[in-house]
Amino acid sequence: MPKIVGTGNYTYEVNEEWAQLPEGWDMPAASVFGDSQDRVFCFNRSPDHHIVIFDREGNYLHHWDAGSFTFAHAIFIDHEGMVWLIDRDIGQVFKYTPEGQLLLTIGTRDYQSDTGIAEISSSLAHTVVRPGEPFN
């Protein structure tokens, strides 16, 4: 019997064989997000390929590296298709094009906020807000 995760209208069947990686690659995915073109972006804790992109069937399309991350934490793709990444340990949020060009960095590397929010990386929803389900 397949493993089902999620609740309500948002349930998914787990497929351990879905991602078709290039030979010899490891992909310790920290966060996954799908875009409007049915591509799946995986933000990984690998020093060699931070962002790996697949089609909806799990076929590898391409990848890009996103600088120097210490702890990949979250990915979000906004309504314009821009890719937002959070590194939990360095306390920064980054905005990239879908092709991997850095557009914006929020926060100072290795400096945690003293505003009462424990980490800038606590939630990507604090950074990017859009109307829609299921999260905002």
Tell where the protein language model's regions lie, with residue ranges:
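Eukaryotic scaffold repeat domains enriched in small/polar residues
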Residues: 1-136
